[in-house]
Amino acid sequence: MARYLGPKLKLSRREGTDLFLKSGVRAIDTKCKLEQAPGQHGARKPRLSDYGVQLREKQKVRRIYGVLERQFRNYYKEATRLKGNTGENLLTLLEGRLDNVVYRMGFGATRAEARQMVSHKAIMVNGRVVNIASYQVSPNDVVSVREKSKKQSRIKAALELAEQREKPTWLEVDAAKMEGVFKRIPERTDLSADINEHLIVELYSK
């Protein structure tokens, strides 16, 4: 599947947030000032219209989860078909992606690294290898690292890094065994308050 291969730090500066979790892996404040717009001197950000604000929020969320436009729109369509709040449904669908779950469990230092692990067949779901990053993990599914991949130093480093993050309450992880259980679908209160999904719903509702 196609994915963005351009300069990621530039995108983070545009959105004003660490989209790709680089700051958790290495210090980036000297190389990339997130509060400044892209450019040598951080060009002044223009004042956005309502549409511009909605578009920026959509782009931010899309890039956080590493999803291209067409796939993101499909997630939104699926969210509208589900019962409940469309915006919250969208976020839970994104959170249920296998690459995101692998990251949340601490097996990958970033979502991009977790996605690579999935595509390289290092991850199993319920004892079977799954190499599709967008695979939707269901409640009670067991996600684990394949035995032959457990010795990879990057996984051990990622688990150490995960100890510094708040542990998701909807997951149960056994770091020693390198496996975890997707206990339940996360609720909105479990997820980042920095995301305004209502803006995305407003954008797609036009």
Curated annotation (Swiss-Prot):
One of its GO terms (cellular component) is small ribosomal subunit. Belongs to the universal ribosomal protein uS4 family. Residues 96-156 form the S4 RNA-binding domain. One of the primary rRNA binding proteins, it binds directly to 16S rRNA where it nucleates assembly of the body of the 30S subunit. With S5 and S12 plays an important role in translational accuracy. It comes from the Bacteria. One of its GO terms (molecular function) is structural constituent of ribosome. Part of the 30S ribosomal subunit. Contacts protein S5. The interaction surface between S4 and S5 is involved in control of translational fidelity. Gene3D superfamilies: Ribosomal Protein S4 Delta 41, Chain A, domain 1, RNA-binding S4 domain. SUPFAM superfamilies: Alpha-L RNA-binding motif. GO terms for biological process: ribosomal small subunit biogenesis; translation. This is Small ribosomal subunit protein uS4. Keywords: Ribonucleoprotein, Ribosomal protein, RNA-binding, rRNA-binding.
